[in-house]
Amino acid sequence: MIKQALISVSDKTGIVDFAKALSALGVKLLSTGGTAKLLADAGLPVTEVADYTGFPEMLDGRVKTLHPKVHGGILARRDLPEHMQALEAHGIPTIDLLVVNLYPFVQTIAKDDCTLADAIENIDIGGPTMLRSAAKNHRDVTVVVDPADYAVVLDEMKANGNTLGYKTNFRLATKVFAHTAQYDGAITNYLTSLGDDLQHGSRSAYPATLNLAFDKVQDLRYGENPHQSAAFYRDVATPAGALANYRQLQGKELSYNNIADSDAAWECVKTFDAPACVIIKHANPCGVAVGADAGEAYAKAFQTDPTSAFGGIIAFNREVDEAAAQAVAKQFVEVLIAPSFSDAAKQVFVAKQNVRLLEIALGEGHNAFDLKRVGGGLLVQSLDSKNVQPRELRVVTKRHPTPKEMDDLLFAWRVAKYVKSNAIVFCGNGMTLGVGAGQMSRVDSARIASIKAQNAGLTLAGSAVASDAFFPFRDGLDVVVAAGATCVIQPGGSVRDDEVIAAADEHNIAMVVTGVRHFRH
């Protein structure tokens, strides 16, 4: 039964109302520093920990709760007579509820002007110590680290005479250990990222010890293949606009492949300013287009490769209206993603309940790192978030691209970044015309892209081509020109650049180089 609570929080969200409710239930309140003042100012009967222990706060607040009267009251097992006798002998009451959250270390180090001294002063000592003590003794002590749990705790206390069940206490304790692990991980990441100049030096993006924290969203039916098990985890600091923030409106449970392909579709479509549609199959775009609205963008994207679009993942960067929904509903689609769906659009899919509809708010946030597991290790890199601007392009041929060709080249280049290497993408009039992906040779990707366009009945005459990496020989260029391309965008940087540029001049096409490669594995 909860008779006495100790409250000490940095994040004071909802704490006054929570404390008022506890007091109304007859719970005695202990508190420290600013929290105690806040509760007292709210008219609550609260005892300062310094008065409770008979030992004053000292060392600028570094020592407040590190006292046997605090930790004895938390750690004592109520089912062991010798523990309770020890408390009685030393005049230590039990502390049955601990409400603590920690100094804002992560928020502090995020500031541009944060110094090592600032960071050190925001490493909480007493808070984690109390939290771990209470979590260890969760059979007898309720511990709350998240303000979102205040209402849950109060509801159960009211329903059970100020008592919480073991399952609730266990769940709350596991949250504590996860929280303190993340907190210590952030401290380690920060300290091991510092260079030799500890006071003024810059931090490395790659600390000597890397701690990552993710919370499980759900278990999945299976992994990439049915014989593999899997689960989906969310970054504890999920950026705005990320796939993990999705809200599923209808449809079957998402699978491993659904989530992977949805991420590829969403990351690609949200890079466009104009209304856009991206259709993904096996993490590769098989159709990308912009249009006057979502419906037009979809019609153009679908036209690229109707065969591959079957059973694909479709993403929009605009609200899906009824017209777009009706067009999509004519095809078999696994997942449909958009910032929003009109009520009429939702009604279209009522008869197709297996279609998964995901809403995700648009946002430009990105993951801090791109991660790839290898045997016994982890490759960590910054995201490939470079979007080349027109002023950064360099024309290397005698003929310059026309304004329309330049628009098509920039569109093709944006798409190529999301195609598995080796990537060749034909585009024109704001849509993909043929996509060659994942081939071991660039010339084969070029051939496949042209064949795809031919199969879809699309002409490549006057098209623009993007290559995610340089042409090692002129053969790939010869293939795209023979197919009808009149301009090419590529990174450049090959030892045979002169040969490739000479071939472009020979064909009287325009070529621009970006100086940026977009390998994607």
Swiss-Prot record:
A single Pfam family, by name?
Answer: AICARFT_IMPCHas
Task: Name a biological process GO annotation.
Answer: 'de novo' IMP biosynthetic process
Pathway recorded for this protein: Purine metabolism; IMP biosynthesis via de novo pathway; 5-formamido-1-(5-phospho-D-ribosyl)imidazole-4-carboxamide from 5-amino-1-(5-phospho-D-ribosyl)imidazole-4-carboxamide (10-formyl THF route): step 1/1; Purine metabolism; IMP biosynthesis via de novo pathway; IMP from 5-formamido-1-(5-phospho-D-ribosyl)imidazole-4-carboxamide: step 1/1
MGS-like domain mapped to chain residues:
1-145
Keywords recorded for this protein, A-Z: Hydrolase, Multifunctional enzyme, Purine biosynthesis, Transferase
Annotated EC: 2.1.2.3, 3.5.4.10
**Coiled-coil parts of chain:** none
Molecular function terms from GO: IMP cyclohydrolase activity; phosphoribosylaminoimidazolecarboxamide formyltransferase activity
- Provide the catalytic activity annotation: (6R)-10-formyltetrahydrofolate + 5-amino-1-(5-phospho-beta-D-ribosyl)imidazole-4-carboxamide = 5-formamido-1-(5-phospho-D-ribosyl)imidazole-4-carboxamide + (6S)-5,6,7,8-tetrahydrofolate; IMP + H2O = 5-formamido-1-(5-phospho-D-ribosyl)imidazole-4-carboxamide
Q: Which GO terms describe its cellular component?
A: cytosol
The source's superkingdom equals Bacteria
Record has Nuclease as a keyword: no
Fetch the InterPro entries from UniProt: AICAR_Tfase_dup_dom_sf, Cytidine_deaminase-like, MGS-like_dom, MGS-like_dom_sf, PurH-like
* Domain characteristics, as noted in the entry: The IMP cyclohydrolase activity resides in the N-terminal region.
Family per record: Belongs to the PurH family.
Task: List the HAMAP family hit by this protein, alphabetically.
Answer: PurH
- Provide the protein name: Bifunctional purine biosynthesis protein PurH
Naturally occurring in which organism (per UniProt): Burkholderia pseudomallei (strain K96243)
